[in-house]
Amino acid sequence: MISRFEPKIIVLSLPKCGSTSIDRFSSLYCNSIHETWHSGITDAIIKYKLGLFPKLSLLNYFDFKYLATEVEVDSSTYNHFLFEDLLERYSESSFICVLRDPLSWCCSMLNMWGYFGRLVLFARQDSVSYDMKEIRTWISWINRYGTLYAPSLNSFSVFRSCQSDSVRLLLPVFEQLLFFWIAYHKRLLHSISSKSNQVKIFKISELDRLARYLGVLLSIPFANKLTMPIENKKLPIAISSIGVSRAINLLSPSSFERLCNNLLLKEAALIYSLALNKAY
């Protein structure tokens, strides 16, 4: 039996929902992690979903991580995949989820994966200056990780579609992401209705309120005056050294609203409204 260390706070938000800001804030006051063991655990999650990795072994992975780091705040962006099990396994922890509207979230995911594709394609043009082996390993993992959210989410295809100004090419993966957002938040709302004291939802537009809530949980002096720092995404060294602007042809929700399946849009709007009503 593995000994268990329970963090004070576990974040259940999807990626692109302020988790980097939460980590930057928390690390000022306590031991905080954000992407620790990210590739290893997400690959284990992929194998688990394929029936190639036992759930107990996957959950033990979390136990080992917490024992090794003795972390107080875990804002890892893969926690949400197993949140029901984490709620049960770490019953002494507090859980939070930052809510972002579904269309904005889908576009942000596409923009991020497109940016990743741009980075790698840029590096390939000057392969002498960069560690291409490390970059290939990283982008291979990124694209495996992307399939957890949408089977068609691939950095290169997203980037090329962005550059061609063809939103229609991205509609299938957008709808896959939207379906994921709906399914996850349905599960979350169901869990909150049965365990209302374990998960607190915060709107992404009110991260300062979240900062004050975290301040209370972490016993930080003057918690009622705390604010959340602006998010600044970190990339691996071999990637961050590539001087590529994020200014690809950015996608916006309005690009997809008139094309997306209307029933899917209505369901997403309903779930978002229900989740907003649960916001702290």
What are these regions (language model features)?
Residues 1-70, 233-238, 250, 280:
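PAPS-dependent sulfotransferase catalytic core
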Residues 1-8, 148-280:
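PAPS-dependent sulfotransferases, especially Golgi type II membrane carbohydrate sulfotransferases
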Residues 11, 71-74, 200-202:
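Short catalytic-loop micro-motif centered on adjacent basic/acidic residues
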Residues 18-30, 87, 108-110, 199-222:
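PAPS/PAP-binding and catalytic site of the sulfotransferase fold
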Residues 24, 44-48, 86, 107-112, ...:
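Short aromatic-enriched loop/helix-cap "lid" or pocket-rim segments at secondary-structure transitions
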Residues 66-83, 98:
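Glycine-rich phosphate-binding loop used to anchor ATP phosphates in small-molecule kinases
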Residues 89-111, 205:
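Conserved phosphate-donor/acceptor-positioning beta-strand/loop module used by diverse small-molecule
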Residues 114-117, 123-126, 131-142, 179-182:
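Catalytic phosphate/metal-binding cores of nucleic-acid and nucleotide-processing enzymes, i.e., regions
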